[in-house]
A protein has these predicted regions:
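Non-catalytic cap/lid and distal C-terminal segments of serine-dependent acyl enzymes
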Residues: 2-259
């Protein structure tokens, strides 16, 4: 026996699956990467990992050791393809928010033995995906126990204006308005409404590198959320908008979630 590998007395073997399927919501073929235990103890907990603007669903598996981090946790990890959608239902276009929050959970639950309990479902992402994770969790607070954002685009108005300046037309079209501040795509507005309604809010974990170009926006969101009394854990450390930072903090977030 190799020392350390089987110290617990159990052998955990993870399967990596690349799933191609037809999305009725998007009206086209799409893809999803999944990491699941080959054997399990009851229904699996679920972690959704969302990618950033310049990547796709394969990036978490290629740039981190997420399969190793998920090992032994009785956890399924799903990495969907959100394209450059900002996880929005794009006006006159593809409905990625509905795809992510409604269609994909139903698809994977038909394939795997997954828990549908709120306390067993989690969502996280980086950059655009960090924005998407917070937005989807705050839009559907009854479905997720916690959400994590790594270097997230959390001041969506500021980011929109930057994209407008740089003439990134596809991103500007995602939100369907000239200024998404305070609207249904703004995590601040969603959080404010939940607090005002006295609703149960998912726990939030936020991490950003101190050299990240989104650092000031992340500090602004942190202070805003704390001002509302939201249950938000914030961490920062040396680093910029890179996988070296995200690979470290996805591990910290998974432990914080209790996975």
């Amino acid at each position: 026996m190799v020392p350390g590998i089987f110290a617990s007395g159990k052998v955990f073997i993870m399967a990596f699956l690349q799933i191609a399927f037809h999305s009725n919501v998007l009206g086209m073929a799409s893809s999803l990467d999944a990491i699941v235990p080959q054997s399990q103890n009851g229904p699996l907990k679920v972690l959704w990992l969302l990618h950033g603007l310049s990547d796709d669903h394969t990036i978490w598996q290629r740039r981190t050791s997420i399969e190793r981090y998920a090992d032994g946790r009785n956890l399924a990890v799903f990495m969907p393809n959100g394209a450059r959608s900002f996880y929005c239902d794009i006006p006159g276009g593809l409905r990625y928010a509905t795809h992510m929050a409604e269609e994909l959970p139903a698809i994977v639950r038909s394939m795997f033995n997954l828990s549908d309990r709120r306390e067993d479902n989690f969502i996280a992402g980086l950059s655009m995906g960090g924005y998407g994770a917070f937005k989807l969790a705050l839009r559907h607070p009854d479905r997720y126990a916690a959400a994590a954002s790594f270097s997230g685009v959390l001041d969506i108005g500021s980011f929109y204006r930057m994209m407008e300046r740089d003439k990134v037309a596809d991103v500007l079209g995602d939100f369907g308005c000239r200024n998404p501040d305070g609207g249904p795509e703004d995590p601040r507005a969603l959080l404010s409404k939940l607090v005002a309604d006295g609703a149960e809010i998912p726990r939030l974990y936020q991490a950003c590198g101190t050299e990240d170009f989104l650092y000031a926006d992340n500090i602004s969101f942190r202070d805003f959320a704390r001002g509302l009394g939201a249950d938000l854990t914030y961490e920062e450390g040396p680093g910029s908008h890179t996988w070296l930072f995200w690979d470290t903090y996805v591990q910290r977030a998974m432990n914080w979630m209790g996975l």
